[in-house]
C-alpha cells in the first residue's frame, strides 16, 4: 500500500515539475506573414527558448504539426518540419507543400502549458493563363491596329503590360475587367506598325516576383497599290469634323445669298412696276389737261380786264355806218345767185367795198398766278 502511494506521489511530482518548467519557456519570435503561389511551398519559423517540451503548429485553427524534443508528430504529408539550434534559442520551421487556395488563413505557433502564441497569415495567389486570339498577326504597314490579351483565372487580378519588339510610330494600351466576368481581365494594345517583329503580353502578380508572358509574331505587309493615296491616306477624325463644319457653313451662306438675291429681284421688280405706273399716270394727266383746259383755269385767277368777243361785236354793230363806206355782199349768198350776178350787166357805178370789222380775230390771254 505504501509502495503504491509512493508511485502516485512520484508521478504527481514529475507532472508538477513539467508544469512548472514548461511555464517558464517563451516564444522569442513568432512566424511572419507569407504570400505563396498556388502549388508552391510556404515556410513559417518560430523561435523559442531552450528547454521546451512540445511545439504545436496550427493552420486555420487545426493543429497540423506537433514537435517534441525526440521527434515530430506529422498528421499530413503536406506538412513537414525542420529545426535549427543556436546558443540561446531553438528555431522550429513548418513547411507547407503544394499550397492550395483554401490554405489561406491564420497560422499559429504555440508551446505546451504556455499562454503565449505566435501568429501569422498565409495568403495564396493563383496564376492563371494568358490568351491572344491569334499567334501570328498580319497587318498593313502604317495602318492602326489593335491586339487583345486575355488574363483568365488569376487571383488576385494581375498587372498586364506589353513588350514591343517591332518598330512603331505610335503605341498605347489599357486594361479593364470583362463585363459580366470579374475574374477575367482584358488588355488592348493599340499600335501603328512600321515593320515585322514580336509582341509580348506580360502579366505580373501584385505581391510576388512571379509573372507569365505570351508572345505573338507580327507580320507587316505593304498596302495594295490601289489604296495608296486613297483609303490608306484616310483623313484624321479632326479633319473630317472640320470639313463637315466648313461645308455646313458654306451651305448656309449659299442659302442666305439665294434669299437675298430673290428679295433684291422682287424689290427691283416692284420698283419698276411702280415707276411704270407713275409714268402712265403722268401721261394720263397730261392728256386730260390738254383736252379739258378748264382744269387749268380753275387753278388760276380771274382777269377782270378781259372782255369777250361777243360783247365787242355787239358794240361795233350798234355804231351807224359811215359815208363812202362800201360794203361787200355777204359771203353767205348761195353759189347760184353768184353765177347769175356774173351774167347780169352791172351798172356803171363806183364799186363799193365794205370791211367787216365786227368780228376781228382776237387772241385770248389767260394769266395764271
Curated annotation (Swiss-Prot):
Extracellular side: 25-239
GO BP: cell-cell adhesion
Domain Ig-like V-type positions: 25-125, 128-217
Main location: membrane
Glycosylation (residues): 33, 45, 146, 196, 217
Stretches the record annotates as Disordered: 321-354
GO-annotated cellular components: apical plasma membrane; bicellular tight junction; cell surface
Primary role: Provides, together with MAGI1, an adhesion machinery at tight junctions, which may regulate the permeability of kidney glomerulus and small intestinal epithelial cells. Mediates calcium-independent homophilic cell adhesion. In testis, it may function as a cell adhesion molecule rather than a tight-junction protein. It may participate in the adhesion between spermatogonia-spermatogonia, spermatogonia-Sertoli cells, and Sertoli cells-Sertoli cells.
Extra information: It may be a useful marker for injured podocytes in puromycin amino-nucleoside nephropathy (PAN) since its expression at the apical surface is altered.
Name this polypeptide is given: Immunoglobulin superfamily member 5
Organism: Rattus norvegicus (Rat)
Source taxonomy: Eukaryota, Metazoa, Chordata, Craniata, Vertebrata
Gene that encodes it: Igsf5
Amino acid at each position: 500500500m505504501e509502495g503504491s502511494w509512493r508511485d502516485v506521489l512520484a508521478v504527481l511530482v514529475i507532472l508538477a515539475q513539467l508544469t512548472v518548467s514548461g511555464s517558464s519557456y517563451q516564444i522569442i519570435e513568432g512566424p511572419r506573414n507569407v504570400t505563396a503561389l498556388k502549388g508552391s511551398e510556404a515556410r513559417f519559423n518560430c523561435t523559442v527558448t531552450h528547454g521546451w517540451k512540445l511545439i504545436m503548429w496550427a493552420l486555420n485553427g487545426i493543429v497540423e504539426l506537433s514537435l517534441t524534443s525526440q521527434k515530430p508528430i506529422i498528421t499530413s504529408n503536406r506538412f513537414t518540419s525542420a529545426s535549427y539550434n543556436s546558443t540561446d534559442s531553438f528555431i522550429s520551421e513548418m513547411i507547407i507543400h503544394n499550397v492550395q487556395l483554401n490554405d489561406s488563413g491564420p497560422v499559429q505557433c504555440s508551446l505546451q502549458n504556455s499562454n503565449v502564441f505566435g501568429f501569422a497569415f498565409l495568403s495564396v495567389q493563383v496564376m492563371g493563363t494568358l490568351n491572344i486570339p491569334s499567334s501570328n498577326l498580319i497587318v498593313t504597314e502604317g495602318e492602326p491596329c489593335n491586339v487583345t490579351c486575355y488574363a483568365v483565372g488569376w487571383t488576385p487580378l494581375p498587372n498586364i503590360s506589353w513588350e514591343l519588339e517591332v518598330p512603331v510610330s505610335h503605341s498605347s494600351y489599357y486594361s479593364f475587367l470583362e463585363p459580366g466576368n470579374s475574374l477575367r481581365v482584358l488588355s488592348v494594345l493599340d499600335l501603328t506598325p512600321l515593320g515585322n517583329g514580336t509582341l509580348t503580353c506580360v502579366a505580373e502578380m501584385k505581391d510576388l516576383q512571379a509573372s507569365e508572358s505570351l508572345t505573338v509574331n507580327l507580320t507587316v505587309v505593304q498596302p495594295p497599290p490601289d489604296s495608296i493615296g486613297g483609303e490608306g491616306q484616310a483623313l484624321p477624325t479632326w479633319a473630317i469634323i472640320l470639313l463637315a463644319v466648313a461645308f455646313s457653313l458654306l451651305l448656309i451662306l449659299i442659302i442666305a445669298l439665294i434669299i437675298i438675291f430673290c428679295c433684291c429681284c422682287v424689290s427691283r421688280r416692284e420698283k419698276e412696276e411702280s415707276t411704270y405706273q407713275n409714268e402712265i399716270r403722268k401721261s394720263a394727266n397730261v392728256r386730260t389737261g390738254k383736252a379739258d383746259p378748264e382744269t387749268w383755269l380753275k387753278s388760276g385767277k380771274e382777269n377782270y380786264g378781259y372782255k369777250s368777243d361777243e360783247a365787242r361785236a355787239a358794240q361795233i354793230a350798234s355804231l351807224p355806218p359811215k359815208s363812202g363806206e362800201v360794203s361787200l355782199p355777204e359771203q353767205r349768198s348761195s353759189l347760184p345767185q353768184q353765177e347769175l350776178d356774173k351774167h347780169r350787166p352791172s351798172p356803171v357805178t363806183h364799186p363799193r367795198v365794205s370791211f367787216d370789222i365786227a368780228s376781228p380775230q382776237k387772241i385770248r390771254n389767260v394769266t395764271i398766278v
